[in-house]
Amino acid sequence: MLNKNCKVEFELNDRELLIFIKGEIDHYSAVLVRGEIDAKIAEVRPKVAILVLSGIDFMDSSGIGLVMGRYARMQNVGGTLVVRDPSERVERILRLAGIERIVKIEKGDKDDEK
């Protein structure tokens, strides 16, 4: 747990890293989440990292930076990044920023939710 407003959990399936982020992504929490995710990516070097955003209640522009930075990090380790299950509001923010041009945004199975 990062703070009372944001929590991150990981699940590794083969070379696929599921990253469950819950709560609010603002400037403060994005810094903490970024560090934790980057450390896990460096540790396991996944082929695919999936940001599961179904638990995000609020996201500002810091969330866009979080996604863009993890995209670059995955490119550096030869992997890909996927955003899964953002709420309508979060998906709208991501699409307004043009994220879907470089990162796949998908709707996943509800079985993947933690």
Task: Label each PLM-derived region with a short phrase.
Residues 59:
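Conserved TIR/SEFIR loop-to-helix hotspot centered on a Trp-containing motif
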Residues 67-71:
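Histidine-anchored nucleotide/phosphate-binding helix
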